[in-house]
Amino acid sequence: MRAHQGIIKIPLEAKTKPDVIKELVDVLKKAGKIEDAESVFRAVMLRENMGSTGLEKGIAVPHAKTHKVNNLVLAIGVSPEGIDFDSLDGEPSKLFFLLIATPQQAGPHIEALSEIARLTRSSNFCKLLLNAKTPKEIVEIFSAQ
């Protein structure tokens, strides 16, 4: 999984689940990865309404499939204080991986979700991300994996 500085927001300013998603969608728009931010936001919120993507141990992976992207895109956000994301363990989420794919990209979408799960199983990896102060540091952490 490749990360570059343009898709990373650290720290997130959002305080609510919808605001986190909006902020990360805006990151993708500014990075030139999507054009129709509102439609992408709605697709992610629709998916969230089906079941929260707040996992455990401070990890959230909001994701959706929509025709409003041309390929698989990722945005990363860090909130050191944490945000209520309706997580499975009831704890605030601190690391956010927003993943958007086309409906035809089921395979790559699942592979990306699996890669995020693999990386975030490492408490050291998560600790490094949480201690990062800049997008550049996050890119370096991903590059070392």
Where in the sequence are the language-model features?
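Cytosolic covalent-transfer regions centered on His/Cys nucleophiles
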Residues: M1-Q145
